[in-house]
């Protein structure tokens, strides 16, 4: 919960939260077959908002402190400035920081998905933690020659998963032009440290051998298991993007649209992490709607039509659910009629009206047309 306090310098808000997780999968999803998992986390929040210069300038500053029992305290400050020279225009500049503690899955997961075993990473993996862990390509190269060569194997280690940290700068404008055009523009840049994603490798049992004075390597092929492990990026990862929103009001008609650009930057690094960004680079919507139209003796007619386009993107899930989600577009439409005397509205509509079957996540179900009829009565 939280509380608000009125002060001479502004409005102060303080709050706190506590959450306890107690999963019980009996070893089917989490590593809790022999030992129960309990995970506690809590946080404290405080912020103050001040308005000065006849409320032309609004300054907001906050700080948040979080603690997960498996990690140290984390502090997340943030601040923003909003300039409103008049009642219809707002310019905003903000800096924010945040910490994302690893989820239960990223800490405790142990699930055999067939092609790979999906595991969390509370204690680390690999050579530094007493395990044989190699890259998939090097394991393939190991078995290519008639006499396998241990030197072909590339061993590596993954440190225990750490909280993901992000710092974001944003600038934006929101306002109206001639009372008919509403605009919302923004640009952001985010820098991630310890970005959480996944790494894939092979684990196996093996022993060094000496036969007739010759040193060898006995790799038990039957013990090979492919693991997908939660991991942090070795390099900083940045994202940036922009969004544009517009509403054009023409009497009872409205034309609206929005566009967003989101870019993940992993170039010029040799970081092996697989980032679970799962966000299309380009996405936009265009809509046309009307309210309470009148046609001769018929009134209370409303409608809306919306076109959505989403660019293709790489979706990262479990190994069998990782791949490209193709670009897709849909058209939604709705027609409604209100009956004032009986306080009732009837609506007919369809999402994806042209039945353009598409995936929104890799490995997910195909999504097609959905039609509906609704009757609403106002009490």
How does the language model describe each region?
Residues 1-71, 184, 256:
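Face-selective signature of the C-terminal outer-membrane beta-barrel domain
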Residues 36-42, 73-75, 165-169, 236-240, ...:
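Residues that define the transmembrane beta-barrel architecture of outer-membrane proteins
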Residues 124-226:
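Membrane-embedded beta-barrel scaffold of Gram-negative outer-membrane proteins
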Residues 1-5, 44-50, 79-85, 171-175, ...:
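Residues on the lipid-exposed face of transmembrane beta-strands in outer-membrane beta-barrel proteins
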Residues 7-9, 18-24, 52, 63-69, ...:
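Transmembrane beta-strands of outer-membrane beta-barrel pores
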Residues 5-11, 52-57, 87-88, 178-180, ...:
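Short loop/turn motifs that connect adjacent beta-strands in outer-membrane beta-barrel proteins
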Residues 52-53, 180-316, 376:
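Gram-negative outer-membrane beta-barrel transporters
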Residues 92-96, 254-261, 273-379:
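Conserved C-terminal beta-signal and adjacent last beta-strands/turns
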